[in-house]
Amino acid sequence: MKRWRIAPSDTPLSPAVVAHVVAGVGTPHLAANFLEAMHRVLPVTFCTVFAVGASGRLETVSAASSYGDTAERTASRYIAERFDRCDPHMLWLGARALPATSQRWVGHHRGDELIDDAYRAACYGDVGIRERASVLLLQPSGQRTAVSFYRSLAQPEFGDEDFARIQSHAVLLAEAAAAHGRAIAAAQTTVEAPLALPLRMLTKREQEVITHLLSGCTAKQTAQRMALS
């Protein structure tokens, strides 16, 4: 089990990937959009997005499977049994001091590293998942978010190249997940063009991040221009 701060990346992001990620903001298909977008660069089985507020309330839950609905059913059990209270990434984020600005990490663990038997069985062993790689976000408000990608026993283990790909997309995924939480809270009902509503849910600073990424800037160049941590 390991976690590390996200270093700015020199890898340019595909505009198609960026657009597909952003298009999921404020819709019931957030994790599905994340999964489809990342499939262009990273073979994975499931994607989940979990956000827990400062009060401990689950605020965002989205899940998607490459096939079937196993991730969705597993996420329902995660909610019902409050496995966020056993989730090592959520516990780690919850134990940290609140930052002045949003902080991001990449986290990784294998199912066999989990202590809680019920959590390990329900979310890993019983559904054939070996490991999870996550983009972790801690906001000044206390909200903590994990955007996670899972590999099954039939897939190769996550390696350095996979972590590099996740890291290069981490800012995009984290900003989109944060914007989604606000969109759901606002309960917008306006129907607009495919990207108009999701983009309107982003703060001005987040819109600047997305604009830089869509223009072909790398995450590192974007961070340098905007002094992102």
What are these regions (language model features)?
Residues 2-9, 13-25, 29, 33-143, ...:
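Regulatory input/activation interfaces that engage signals or partners
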Residues 177-194:
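Short alpha-helical interdomain "coupling" segment at the junction between an upstream regulatory sensor module
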Residues 69-70, 185-186, 229:
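Juxtamembrane/interface motifs at transmembrane-helix termini
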Residues 190-229:
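Helix-turn-helix DNA-binding segment
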